[in-house]
């Protein structure tokens, strides 16, 4: 995360996990029943007696904030400058967690519907952090979605899930302290237009599915997968973020709202108004992101309403019938006047780069099934032949261990980086970092 991870009010189309809350209610602990939602209180979060004034430094604090403010360019490739920042910062191990005075605000990153995000540094250990500051309404208090997100994230510990370090509660604000990430997948793709290196797509996709398999095993649905909600470190670690719409799920399904997931990544069953769904909801979004990484552009963009979104999907998958999708005609938004045309098309015909990578089209087709029960699970997708080129050690990693701890696992330079290198007369071997 960094200057590249802005709120959607700052850069249209960007909704990084700190800045894009504001969905409907969502539950927070596995399969906890809806009737217990009122049981969540602010006391479930860590309370602190210190004020939040230190997040708006004045005087000496302001001078320190300016001194340690990162000057990293938009490419976010210079992680060494941040290391210099940490080495020059005098931290105090005696400072407590849960106190606003333990963190120093460096710069504002963005602002969302009810949260403002700052890049900060921990005065406890010198680590860079992201400070998500939520102002509490005098009448309504903390947005309930924030309480749910915090409660959920405190129970999810995985290398491909963004880490919540600390929670600070005062009378005026609630602050989430997250690990600092350098960028998100949307920004990474915009910095490398025309599609990503096939090797990098494979690594990113493996990490995405690994994170999904974990949360689905914990009975949690993300419900808002999109590139902006997938954070990337300077090494290339991909992490699921923005659990503002996430909620616990029952097995196999439960009645929820159909108004979930950004429109471009919303599956046809949700578009048709289905309120009973399970983990296959996230699988559709992951499949859309999978192909988008190859193609360099969204699969079904530019639509403004549900009907147009469905029409774009039907152009590829064909219009569903009771034979291909049992029960589809009973869904609220199903239109009986739709004609059973066009016929389904091969994915590689629509998105040509899929056909250039062995097994990529087969995996994508298993994720983008119209009938939700036909979609592959995240755990099944991880053992698909598409990933056979990756080291077998990846499957033995503990949940909290990164892929990049395995020898030889690293991102390759993207094509635009290689071209820029040759234009400058440099050799590709000089790439010491992932981008």
From Swiss-Prot:
Keywords for this protein: ATP-binding, Kinase, Magnesium, Metal-binding, Nucleotide-binding, Serine/threonine-protein kinase, Transferase
GO molecular function: ATP binding; cyclin binding; cyclin-dependent protein serine/threonine kinase activity; metal ion binding; protein serine kinase activity; protein serine/threonine kinase activity
Enzyme class: transferase
Residues annotated for ATP binding in this entry: 109-117, 132
GO cellular component: a single term: cytosol
E.C. code: 2.7.11.22
Listed cofactors: Mg(2+)
Result, substituting residue 276 to D: In a breast infiltrating ductal carcinoma sample; somatic mutation
Domain Protein kinase: 103-387
Recorded catalytic activity of this chain's protein: L-seryl-[protein] + ATP = O-phospho-L-seryl-[protein] + ADP + H(+); L-threonyl-[protein] + ATP = O-phospho-L-threonyl-[protein] + ADP + H(+)
Database matches in Gene3D superfamilies: Phosphorylase Kinase, domain 1, Transferase(Phosphotransferase) domain 1
CDD domains listed in its UniProt record: STKc_PFTAIRE2
Database matches in InterPro entries: CDK, CDK15_STKc, Kinase-like_dom_sf, Prot_kinase_dom, Protein_kinase_ATP_BS, Ser/Thr_kinase_AS
Disulfide-bond pairs as recorded: none
Entry-linked Pfam families: Pkinase
Effect of residue 93 to E: In a renal clear cell carcinoma sample; somatic mutation
BP terms from Gene Ontology: regulation of cell cycle phase transition
Domain of life: Eukaryota
Active site per the UniProt annotation: 224 (proton acceptor)
Free-text function comment from the UniProt entry: Serine/threonine-protein kinase that acts like an antiapoptotic protein that counters TRAIL/TNFSF10-induced apoptosis by inducing phosphorylation of BIRC5 at 'Thr-34'.
Family affiliation: Belongs to the protein kinase superfamily. CMGC Ser/Thr protein kinase family. CDC2/CDKX subfamily.
Protein name, as recorded: Cyclin-dependent kinase 15
């Amino acid at each position: 995360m960094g200057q590249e991870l802005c709120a959607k009010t700052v850069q249209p189309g960007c909704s990084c996990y700190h800045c894009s809350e504001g969905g409907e209610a969502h539950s927070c602990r596995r399969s906890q029943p809806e009737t217990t939602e009122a049981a969540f209180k602010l006391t479930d979060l860590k309370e602190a007696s210190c004020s939040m004034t230190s997040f708006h430094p004045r005087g000496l604090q302001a001078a320190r904030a300016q001194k340690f403010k990162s000057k990293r360019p938009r490419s976010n490739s210079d992680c060494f400058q941040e290391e210099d920042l940490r080495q020059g910062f005098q931290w105090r191990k005696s400072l407590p967690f849960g106190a606003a005075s333990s963190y120093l605000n460096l710069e504002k990153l963005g602002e969302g519907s009810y949260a403002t995000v700052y890049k900060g540094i921990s005065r406890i250990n010198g680590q860079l952090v992201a400070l998500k500051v939520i102002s509490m309404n005098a009448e309504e208090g903390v947005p309930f979605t924030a309480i749910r997100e915090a409660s959920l994230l405190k129970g999810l510990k995985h290398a491909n899930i963004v880490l919540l370090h600390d929670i600070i509660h005062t009378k005026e604000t609630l602050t989430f302290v997250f690990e600092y990430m350098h960028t998100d997948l949307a920004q990474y793709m915009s910095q490398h237009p025309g599609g990503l290196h096939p090797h990098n797509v494979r690594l990113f996709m493996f990490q995405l599915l690994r994170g999904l398999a974990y949360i689905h095993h914990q009975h949690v649905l993300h419900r808002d997968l999109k590139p902006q909600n997938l954070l990337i470190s300077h090494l290339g670690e991909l992490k699921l973020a923005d659990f503002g719409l996430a909620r616990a799920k029952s097995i196999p399904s439960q009645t929820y709202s159909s108004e979930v997931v950004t429109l471009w990544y919303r599956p046809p069953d949700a578009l048709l108004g289905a309120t009973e769904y399970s983990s296959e909801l996230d699988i559709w979004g992951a499949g859309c992101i999978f192909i988008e990484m190859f193609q360099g552009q969204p699969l079904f963009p530019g639509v403004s309403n549900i009907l147009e979104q469905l029409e774009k999907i039907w152009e590829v998958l064909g219009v569903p019938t009771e034979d291909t999708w049992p029960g589809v005609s009973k869904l609220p938004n199903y239109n009986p006047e739709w004609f059973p045309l066009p016929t389904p098309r091969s994915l590689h015909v629509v998105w040509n780069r899929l056909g250039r990578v062995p097994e990529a089209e087969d995996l994508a087709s298993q994720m983008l099934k119209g009938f939700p029960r036909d979609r592959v699970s995240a755990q099944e997708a991880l053992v698909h032949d598409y990933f056979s080129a990756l080291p077998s050690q990846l499957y033995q990693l503990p949940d909290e261990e990164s892929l990049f701890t395995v020898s030889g696992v690293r991102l390759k330079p993207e094509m635009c980086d290689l071209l820029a290198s040759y234009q400058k007369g440099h050799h590709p071997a000089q790439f010491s970092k992932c981008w």
